[in-house]
Regions:
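Short alpha-helix capping/helix-loop boundary micro-motifs
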Residues: 2, 24-28
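Short, surface-exposed secondary-structure edge patches
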Residues: 5, 29-33
Length: 81
């Protein structure tokens, strides 16, 4: 199912498929390693405030507005990184 990162729950693994936003947002996320095709795990998402994710063993916090610009899909066994 395709949705925004902010819609996912704790401990879910997802694959980033698109970034909605202007060049500045896109470049900032690319610099953080958030590129289409990368697998993320949601560490903390309580429905408000920032979201904590794990990316290749590194935890990072994203503001909710930024997380709403990330379009993700559920990870399948065949897509694990």
């Amino acid at each position: 199912m395709i949705c925004k990162l902010s819609d996912k729950k704790n401990n879910e693994k997802v694959v980033l498929i698109n970034i909605k936003g202007g060049y500045g947002v896109y470049q900032r996320l690319l610099d953080m390693g958030l590129v289409p095709g990368v697998t993320l795990e949601i560490s903390h998402n309580h429905g408000f405030g920032p979201i904590t994710i794990s990316l290749k063993g590194t935890k990072m916090m994203l503001g909710r507005g930024l997380a709403e610009k990330l379009i993700v899909k559920e990870e399948n066994n065949s897509e694990k990184n």
